[in-house]
Amino acid sequence: KFSIAKNHLIPATLGEHGLDADSLVIDDDALRAVIDRYTREAGVRWLKKQLARIARYASEKIVSGTAARPYVVTAEMLDPILGREVVRQETARNVAVPGVVTGLAWTPVGGEILFIEGTSMPGKGNLTLTGQLGDVMKESATISMSLARSRLAYKANGFDFIASDVHIHVPSGATPKDGPSAGIALFAALASLITGITVDPKTAMTGEITLSGTVLPVGGIREKVLAAHRAGIRTVILPSENRRDLEDIPDEVRYEIHFIFVDTIDQVLFEALGVDLHETRAPIPVRNRVIPVENI
């Protein structure tokens, strides 16, 4: 969109409003801000309308003599010209909280980060899911819970699966969400909640999981990584089979993010939480009794 606007839309808009490059200059940061904060579409129709609003505003200033030529538009000037931003950009959080993980999603208008939040309470082992999740995403959460119960019993830090209910919420509840690509993020959120170990809020992840613990490739990697970069994410965990998709990501973005590739949820646990499932197992506390692993 940036290239299309720079090379085609802006010159056309200037001509339509009787302006030229010596009359109006929209700097690169302002153009990126218009794209990110004032448009949300797969095409460029709304972007063209916003550029036209800027051109009309500049024309009025120049004709009235209240602005010199060229009239330079910066990102800081967009609020009085276009009003409040219409797209709220999520940014990486600064505080790590057990049970909270950053995922990556693809939408028809580009990628975005999403937060997966988990909490627990006394109960009977039930799993509650909220945030307008579709059937496929609910299945991913169920798989994640089964994997957590089967893999993390001896790492549970006193967590009682039988006597606890777990609630997973994905904010922006008014927006429907679906698809399998949040699998590893859902699992990591549950693992963080159960172990009490936090995940770096500057780390984001995407990938489908199976009941055997395999991590499968997902789509929309370019859009997801670009969204992560915009949000201030420093590390992205991806399925190994998506490694080739990095070729589609601009160099300036690819070199500023640390990529980690995984094949299994065991690797996700190690990379995201520092939990090694292959180390020597300690006895498992089960309801007030300590039972050696080999006797379970």
What are the functions of these language-model segments?
Residues 70, 88-93, 97-102, 109-296:
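Peripheral, non-AAA+ core regions of ATP-driven protein-machinery
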Residues 30-120, 124-133:
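Conserved catalytic-core segments of large NTP-driven translation/proteostasis enzymes
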Residues 5-6, 10, 31, 55, ...:
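Alpha-helical structural signal
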Residues 2-52, 57-71, 151-163, 196-202, ...:
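Conserved C-terminal "switch" segment of AAA+ ATPases
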Residues 27, 74, 250:
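Residue-level signal for threonine
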Residues 8, 38-39, 85, 272-276:
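Alpha-helix boundary/capping residues
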